[in-house]
Amino acid sequence: MTGWESKSDNGQTHAINLGFAKTTGEIMAWINSDDIILPGTLSYIADYFNRHPKIDVVYGNRIQIDINDKQIGRWILPEHDNNVLSWTDFVPQETLYWRRSIWEKVGGRLDESFRFAMDWDFLVRLRDAGARFARLPRFMGGFRVHPKQKTSSEIGDIGLQEMNDIRLRLIGKIPTEREIFKAVKPYLIKHSFTDLIWRIRNAFGNPY
């Protein structure tokens, strides 16, 4: 760690922007205070970017943990799908990393009008700027689940409104849940298949 600052701000997104304004590195990410980066991830990401200079954005699988750091679930994702991003955000934020060059290309800031869906908005802006994504077959982050987290308490009001605003912008309307499910169903099938393959390999001592 090369710096630390604690002061009043205008919300989480503003605070993240303040932090990024002080950075100089070529690989960028943020981590929320509840969540964790899994051991070995940073060196793995640095090596991957060095070996794949044409990739702009990467993310990976997540584990879910409780307040005692006990693992309570997993997200094992299929290959990246740009089209699905118009309908929903499937990228685990705590596993997301990108190059500074693509950050600067999209303006070098998160949109501070978002309190909840700033990461989804950011992903869409990256996609629309031509960013090349890669989903990496590795558990890279841990997402903490507890009753008082912002994700749980506000998704029913502010979060839902922000997500609908993004969908309206991208597809021209606010779709029904049925329409969303129909649009993302092929991805969900791939998700289930990828999860099954992982469990089979893991059962035989060969997880990827």
Where are these regions (language model features)?
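Short aromatic/hydrophobic "clamp" motif used to bind/position activated sugar donors
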Residues: M28
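Membrane-proximal basic amphipathic "stem/tether" segments
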Residues: L168-Y208
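The conserved acidic donor/metal-binding loop of glycosyltransferases
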Residues: N32-I36, N61
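Conserved donor NDP-sugar-binding/catalytic core segment of glycosyltransferases
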Residues: G40-I72
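Conserved donor sugar-nucleotide recognition element shared by glycan-biosynthetic enzymes
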Residues: Q12-I16, T41, E94
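Glycine-rich, basic loop-to-helix element that forms the pyrophosphate-binding segment
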Residues: K7-T23
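Conserved nucleotide-sugar donor-binding catalytic segment
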Residues: I76-I166
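Short glycine/serine/threonine-enriched helix-capping/active-site loop
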Residues: K7, V57-R62, L136, F143
